[in-house]
């Protein structure tokens, strides 16, 4: 098999993804990154008292790989808002990693007050373990997805391999970087984006789609366990000709390192990526943090929360904010998981479960 799988364990405190961090960091992939943000020092509040009676409340947001900058900004703003409105200090801890790995951590006992993961299937997996209600997606607007993204290609300045669309990723001599769909939610969006393109190109032929996607993955040089790790491999380590990436991650790379180093190629057809959010009922009931946790997620839908999402290159749901940032996001023909794959449950079972299509294509 022409690629290696990079898997590491451990945790570090996350640093802001600045230009210095990109160029000087070790690039080690981590299963969890923890950031303390908000006002005041971290104070444990894990007890059964109601959060409304506490002067300081601590939340843990377990999120997927590329949301570090988003929630670093959002947590500070939410803490200020909540302090002014309710007189409480809120400290938010962040844990980041591949979405699938993060979901398993919550299932295994990581006490997340809220989860903000890459795809609904990962939160459904937590729900199946009775940690939150089955109808969790109905609690907030837009199926509990306050912002969206899509999948694009990041190439080096001048686009030396002439990458224009998904077909170019199958060509001999093109080195592709993408994360491992067994551990990364972003990687599953990447994979289904390629599969959906192939279906539309080849009159819905599953065999042709399998052949097409298989050829892309034959060109993959490294499969990191998460989207940020894949970005580090491409951007910092200089490996690969093209990175299949979240749009927000590609735009952030340009912002941090400059358009003189990288270009973004938007494919003719891509997938509507909808990363959802949810309160983990079992944890907030135990800790007495339900009111704050619910307010935290609701604030994502506020105009200020939507502004923060847009500034961090996520496509906002709010029409007013979306119009303001329209020039930032190119128009692209999008399809959904429901339209082409019958929903995440079917897509997961067919493609990513043990023994599924991905394993069939890449077993040694």
Q: Residue ranges of each PLM-predicted region?
A:
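Extracellular/periplasmic juxtamembrane helices and adjacent flexible linkers that interface
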Residues: 284-364
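Sec-exported extracytoplasmic/periplasmic mature domains
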Residues: 75-84, 107-111, 120, 127-131, ...
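Ligand-binding pocket segment of bilobal, Venus flytrap-like solute-binding proteins
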Residues: 202-268
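Short, low-complexity disordered leader/linker segments with a strong preference
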Residues: 1-58
């Amino acid at each position: 098999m022409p690629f290696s799988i990079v898997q590491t364990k451990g945790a570090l405190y996350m640093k802001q993804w600045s230009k210095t961090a990109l160029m000087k960091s070790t690039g080690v992939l981590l299963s969890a990154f923890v950031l303390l943000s908000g006002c005041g020092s971290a104070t444990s509040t894990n007890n059964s008292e109601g959060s409304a009676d506490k002067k300081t409340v601590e939340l843990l947001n377990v999120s997927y790989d590329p949301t570090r900058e988003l929630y670093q900004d959002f947590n500070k703003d939410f803490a200020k808002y909540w302090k002014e409105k309710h007189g409480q200090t809120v400290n938010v801890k962040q844990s980041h990693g591949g979405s699938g790995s993060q979901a398993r951590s919550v299932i295994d006992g990581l006490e997340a007050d809220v989860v903000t993961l890459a795809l609904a299937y990962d939160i459904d997996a937590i729900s199946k373990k009775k940690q939150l209600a089955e109808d969790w997606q109905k609690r907030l607007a837009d199926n509990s997805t306050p912002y969206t993204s899509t999948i694009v290609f990041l190439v080096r300045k001048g686009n030396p391999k002439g990458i224009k669309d998904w077909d170019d990723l199958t060509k001999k001599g093109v080195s592709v970087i993408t994360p491992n769909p067994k551990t990364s939610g972003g990687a599953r969006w990447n994979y289904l984006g390629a599969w959906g393109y192939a279906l539309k190109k080849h009159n819905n032929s599953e065999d042709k789609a399998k052949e097409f996607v298989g050829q892309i993955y034959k060109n993959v040089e490294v499969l990191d366990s998460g989207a940020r790790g894949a970005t580090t491999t491409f951007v910092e380590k200089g490996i690969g000709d093209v990175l299949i990436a979240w749009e927000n991650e590609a735009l952030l790379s340009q912002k941090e390192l400059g358009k003189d180093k990288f270009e973004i190629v938007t494919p003719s057809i891509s997938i509507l990526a909808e990363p959802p959010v949810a309160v983990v009922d079992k944890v907030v009931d135990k800790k007495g943090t339900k009111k704050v946790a619910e307010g935290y997620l609701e604030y994502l839908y506020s105009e200020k929360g939507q502004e923060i999402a847009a500034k961090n290159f996520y496509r906002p749901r709010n029409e007013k904010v979306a119009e303001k940032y329209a020039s930032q996001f190119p128009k692209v023909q999008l399809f959904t998981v429901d339209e082409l794959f019958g929903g995440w449950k079917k897509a997961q079972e067919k493609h990513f479960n043990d023994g599924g299509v991905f394993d069939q294509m890449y077993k040694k």
